[in-house]
Amino acid sequence: MIPKVYLNPKLSLYERRRQLIAVLYERQSDTVGNLAFEFNVSSHTIRNDIRILELEYPIYTKIGAGGGVFILDSSRLL
């Protein structure tokens, strides 16, 4: 199955970040490399997006085995 995001690779900065949040809420986690591939951008771009989004959303990253980008389920924040 082709990821939905990859079908429309030319997204604005705002739209890419909005869809990145949606993808993370749907999956709960993913790797930077996989997200970069799906959004048709570099890993560096995804890392920059994550740094900005961490300021407003419960996103965190983990390096190493089992690492990636994670988002906390909003129901767990209460």
Predicted segments with their positions:
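Short, basic/aromatic recognition patches that contact phosphate-bearing ligands
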Residues: 1-78
